[in-house]
């Protein structure tokens, strides 16, 4: 089920925020199997750690800008306002390169959330290994690691995760219907997510099933809970918040695929 890509269309230098990265940094334009264009850039950043404003606190780390999962309901699409990207959400990815973290032990006791506005384990992580590099730099610290993902690639880094005293891995699962999942995102199948959750749980690492977003009339919360209850330490719930650009997209999908749920279609 690994994503298939073919054909590098161009390879050119890229300037980011007015700075020209070193010569090894390039842009690749890749065409997916359906010929949808996806632009991959490698960029240099000064610091990958950001003080988090999320309720969970601590620090937020996003090894990438953008996310190829292209979830139709993704709140992180607002990031385009700050990065200057004009491409549609899900069709660009900036791969961050940063200087080695200075004194990693300063994060002892701090919660570090990996993947608040991207997925650190999307398919390209298999090649770029930026999330793994981050974990390697934090190895030996007492930082509390929290990973948010829709992937099973996190299993690759189980060797590193076992070395931290406090680790939580959360998977977003808002359906058991694979067709609906395919309509909403390009991440791995629900079965692969749940299988990874079980393996991480059996390895002694705390797991979370994040039922988000809940689509009224579509998401069967009870069925998901019954499916994961034996290997999810925590279950989090989040409502569907329709706002911005994706409100139009989601409502268009509902009218087409589930007209019975659209109040406008009810006479």
Tell where the protein language model's regions lie, with residue ranges:
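Conserved C-terminal portion of the radical SAM core fold
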Residues: 192-249
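Short, positively charged and aromatic/hydrophobic N-terminal segments
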Residues: 5-8, 12, 16-19, 31
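Short, acidic/turn-prone active-site loops that include or flank metal/cofactor-
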Residues: 173-177, 239-242
């Amino acid at each position: 089920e690994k994503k298939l890509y073919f054909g590098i269309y161009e390879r050119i230098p890229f300037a980011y925020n007015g700075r020209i990265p070193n010569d090894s940094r390039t842009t690749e334009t890749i065409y997916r199997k359906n010929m949808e264009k996806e632009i991959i850039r490698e960029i240099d950043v000064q610091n990958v750690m950001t003080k988090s404003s999320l309720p969970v606190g601590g620090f937020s780390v996003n090894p990438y800008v953008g996310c190829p999962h292209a979830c139709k309901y993704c709140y992180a699409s607002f990031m385009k306002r700050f990065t200057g990207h004009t491409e549609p959400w899900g069709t660009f990815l900036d791969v961050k390169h940063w200087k080695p973290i200075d004194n990693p032990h300063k994060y002892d006791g701090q919660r570090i959330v990996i993947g608040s506005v991207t997925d650190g384990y999307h398919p390209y992580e298999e090649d770029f290994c930026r999330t793994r590099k981050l974990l390697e730099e934090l190895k030996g610290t007492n930082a509390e690691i929290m990973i948010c993902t829709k992937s099973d690639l996190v299993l690759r880094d189980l060797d590193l995760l076992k070395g931290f005293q406090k680790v939580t891995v959360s998977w977003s699962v808002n359906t058991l219907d694979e067709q609906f999942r395919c309509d909403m995102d390009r991440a791995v199948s629900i079965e692969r997510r749940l299988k990874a959750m079980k393996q991480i749980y059996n390895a002694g690492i705390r797991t979370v099933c994040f039922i988000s977003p809940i689509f009224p009339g579509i998401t069967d919360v009870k069925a998901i809970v019954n499916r994961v209850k034996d290997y999810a330490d925590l279950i989090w719930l989040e409502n569907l918040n329709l706002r911005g650009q994706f409100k139009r997209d989601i409502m268009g999908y509902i009218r087409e695929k589930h007209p019975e749920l659209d109040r406008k279609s009810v006479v």
